[in-house]
Amino acid sequence: MKLTMVASPPTDRRLRTLKQLGADFAVHYDMAGLPDDFEALRAIRAHYETFGLPWKVAESGPAIDRIVLGKEGAAEQIEQYKRIVGHLGKLGVEVVAYNFMPQVTEDAMVVRTSFDARTRGGARTSGFRRSEL
């Protein structure tokens, strides 16, 4: 098993601490602001590697609010998403933990109508039904 941790923001102090705690790999969180330029992404990877932490996981993924909500600009976001994922693959990032929950308001990203919905095997989760709003 390999230990992967997030440091957000990835300051030098936090990355040193992750390495001291035994992290094998870095998780980069807050990709909404990630550049889609290959060299800029390579610089992010180099920052992690300075601390002996290969960048293997990108959590949250590029912005996809227009895609999820079917708004104008969705096609451009799809192209940007594809470009960033392609760059991440070339840089050795193996996992993109995407987040398909759109920003609903300035303060809320997720809207739920239930905190006791059932899913596979009877497990409980949160849920959303438009009819319950």
Report residues per predicted region.
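N-terminal small/glycine-rich loop or linker at the start of catalytic domains
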Residues: 1, 53-68
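Mobile, glycine- and charge-enriched loop segments
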Residues: 1-8, 44-49, 63
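Short, acidic/polar
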Residues: 7-20, 37-44, 76-87
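Active-site-proximal loop/turn and secondary-structure-junction residues that shape catalytic pockets
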Residues: 9-11, 32, 61-62, 100-104
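Glycine-enriched alpha-helix->loop->beta-strand junction motifs that scaffold or abut catalytic
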Residues: 21-25, 92-93
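Active-site acidic/histidine proton-transfer and metal-coordination neighborhood
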Residues: 67-133
